[in-house]
Amino acid sequence: MKSRTILAFDFGTKSIGVAIGQEITGTARPLTSFKAQEGIPDWQKVEKLLSEWQPDLVVVGLPLNMDGTEQPLTARARKFANRLHGRFGVAIALHDERLSTVEARADLFERGGFKALDKGSVDAASAVIILESWFEAQH
């Protein structure tokens, strides 16, 4: 089995979290987060991440309502994924991200209390949860 390097994005209109993982181990770790202006990232930062890590696949979290229906942010996350593919030619997978932020907050709080709950840490941790959930769904 070939080990693929996979980047995951937790898309948001104000901030985007990023994680990196290896498919063969099914593990991920937080990389970074960066600000977005109304959902538009600094594309130079995105390009730098993609060229540095050279992922075989990019997973973008898809924000859905608890009943699985789409919300306004869902279309924006899809648009972000389409732009990633269009600009950089990377393979894209969309993955349900319901409750990833809640889980990330709980994990971070457990490890470091309120001090660990800064926005960037939460977004990057959410990207880890999205990617690990995607790994689990593949098996």
UniProtKB/Swiss-Prot annotation:
Full protein name: Putative pre-16S rRNA nuclease
Keywords: Cytoplasm, Hydrolase, Nuclease, Ribosome biogenesis
Disulfide bridges in this chain: none
UniProt family annotation: Belongs to the YqgF nuclease family.
Main location: cytoplasm
A Pfam family reported for this protein in Swiss-Prot or TrEMBL: RuvX
GO biological processes: rRNA 5'-end processing
Function: Could be a nuclease involved in processing of the 5'-end of pre-16S rRNA.
Source superkingdom: Bacteria
EC primary class: hydrolase
A single cellular component GO annotation: cytosol
Organism expressing this protein natively: Pectobacterium carotovorum subsp. carotovorum (strain PC1)
Entry-linked SUPFAM superfamilies: Ribonuclease H-like (SSF53098)
Presence of keyword DNA-binding: no
Molecular functions per Gene Ontology: nuclease activity
Assigned EC number: 3.1.-.-
Location within or outside the cell: Cytoplasm
